[in-house]
Regions:
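Adenine nucleotide phosphate-binding catalytic loops in nucleotide-utilizing enzymes
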Residues: 2-3, 7, 67, 185-192, ...
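A short, glycine/Asx- and small/polar-enriched loop/turn
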Residues: 59-62, 149-151, 246, 257-259
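Phosphate-binding loop of NTP-binding sites
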Residues: 20-23, 43-44, 57, 68-230, ...
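Generic structural signal for helix capping and beta-alpha/helix-loop junctions
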Residues: 38, 59, 97, 140-141, ...
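Gly/Ser/Thr-rich beta-alpha loop segments that engage phosphate groups in nucleotides
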Residues: 10-15, 32, 54, 110, ...
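A short acidic, often aromatic-flanked loop/helix-cap motif at beta-alpha or helix-coil junctions
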Residues: 55-59, 93-97, 237-243, 258
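N-terminal leader/targeting and accessory segments in enzymes
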Residues: 1-93, 215, 230, 249-254, ...
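Residues in the short beta-alpha loop(s) of Rossmann-like NAD(P)-binding domains
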Residues: 32-34, 136, 213-214, 237, ...
Length: 329
């Protein structure tokens, strides 16, 4: 049995990959400075987790995967290289996992965790049984990753350290784009350039779905079109044909008794022409309406039932640490 060792297994990114490999039948071990909640969950699932980094931890491993936070001076990295064990960065390993899958990658400064989770839940409810990696624990599942039997692979595309440039998306979602991670991107232009490279990973028949309300995300639409790719713009209000012949728009927003918004989602993505479905979310905030529009756009691009997709989104319960209810008084 192939053994894969993860250095920095306690983070949301590596813990998710570790879970996928464990579910796929690999022997999985890992180490981190402390036993984080993610690491503890993996322990409960049968993964051996070492607290602290020591050369002996990699002994017998076939592959080693390291977090972007782990330097090449880490004792386990040095031991693996000296032993001739291949050491992969997270981004390189993720790209391999997505091979031969329909990759759906969600990027953006804000909202990517919830949007990734929404899409994963929606596709699951529609019977597609996707694999997914989310940067937080999904309330509907209680985990941040799962290896499904379907062809879709939904992944949160982390721009930190340009991780998302190792992915293989067929559908890319960009929620918004603001200057972040100045240690990686000294200027906004540096960050925007990385996002241009990200959408450049789409195949010629791939699709970019982006918010037309956000200047940074909307700026990517004409660039994707210039490359011949399909583009979809989404927003709460406004002219949807700007930069995109295909659109998804929310209209008639009203708060509902569950704490979220009820609204009509209209789109011209389907071959049948403009159609509209009613959506009633239980997760609060207009930002989640936007996240739902991105998710519905994915469903429309994949040719799935928008009515059933809307029902599934109404059952979405959110993700951990994102407006999470911790108790009631």
């Amino acid at each position: 049995m192939t053994r894969v060792h993860f250095i920095g297994i306690g983070g949301s990114g590596l813990s998710a990959i570790a879970r996928l490999l464990k579910e796929s039948g690999y022997q999985v071990t890992g180490s981190d400075k402390t036993l984080t909640p993610f690491a503890a969950d993996l322990q409960a699932a049968g993964v051996t987790v070492y607290v602290g980094h020591h050369p002996r931890n990699v002994s017998g491993a076939d592959w080693v995967v390291k977090s972007s936070a782990i330097s090449d001076d880490n004792p386990e990295v040095r031991a693996a290289l000296q032993a001739g064990i291949p050491v992969y960065k997270r981004s390189d390993f993720l790209g391999q996992l997505m091979t031969n899958k329909t990759g759906i990658a969600v990027a953006g400064t804000h909202g990517k965790t919830t949007t990734t989770a929404m899409i994963a839940w929606m596709l699951s409810a529609l019977g597609r049984d996707p694999s997914f990696i989310v940067g937080g624990v999904m309330a509907n599942y209680g985990v941040n990753a799962r290896m499904g039997k379907g062809n879709a692979f939904v992944i949160e595309a982390d721009e930190y350290d340009r991780m998302f440039l190792g992915l293989q998306p067929r559908i890319a979602v960009v929620t918004n784009l603001e200057h972040d991670h100045p240690d990686c991107y000294p200027t906004f232009e540096d960050m925007f350039s990385a996002f241009e490279q990200f959408i450049g990973l789409l195949p010629p028949d791939g699709t970019l779905i982006a918010s037309s309300e956000d200047e940074g995300a909307a700026s990517l639409l004409p660039r994707a079109r210039k490359g011949g790719r399909h583009v979809v713009a989404y927003s709460l209000q406004g002219e949807m044909t700007i930069n995109s012949p295909q659109w998804m728009q929310a209209r008639s927003l009203k708060t509902n008794e569950r704490g979220g918004f009820t609204f009509n989602a209209s789109t011209n993505i389907a071959e049948a022409g403009v159609q509209s479905v009613s959506v009633s979310l239980q997760v609060p905030g207009e930002h989640n309406v936007r996240n739902a529009l991105a998710s519905l756009s994915v469903a429309a691009v994949m040719g799935l039932s928008l009515k059933n997709a809307a029902i599934a989104l109404g059952e979405f319960k959110g993700t951990g640490r994102r407006f999470q209810v911790l108790g009631e008084k």
